[in-house]
Regions:
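Active-site mouth of glycoside hydrolases
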Residues: 2-111
Length: 111
């Protein structure tokens, strides 16, 4: 498939953009995480996910509809088999509260 057949026209892009609500949100790190690595590593993830669920419910209740998170490469590097599952659970939790997620990829220089 060529790039031109899948590329949106400017009109289609504006129609999509104008049909979306205004983004209201924040850069997100759970209150029980000391840094971005702690948010994603397997250690204590279940506890962090409970906190995330509670905090995203609160965020939605005050009108937030979007958050930005940073995925840290060192966690993926060390836990590459289990990390995608944790990330998916995070996305499902955000979606449950009507919150979209802007993902930023960290690298090994951001530690």
């Amino acid at each position: 498939m060529s790039n031109t057949s899948t590329r949106w026209s400017p009109e289609r892009a504006w129609k999509w953009y104008n049909g979306r609500p205004w983004f209201r949100g924040c850069n997100y790190l759970p209150s029980d995480c000391c840094n971005r690595i702690a948010m994603w590593q397997a250690l204590d993830f279940e506890t962090h996910l409970e906190t995330i669920d509670r905090e995203l419910a609160l965020a939605a209740s005050i009108g937030y509809n979007s958050i930005r998170v940073i995925l840290e490469y060192p966690v993926f590097e060390q836990e590459h088999d289990s990390f995608p599952g944790r990330f998916e659970r995070f996305l499902v939790t955000a979606s449950k509260h009507g919150i979209s997620v802007m993902v930023c990829f960290g690298n090994d220089c951001t530690v």
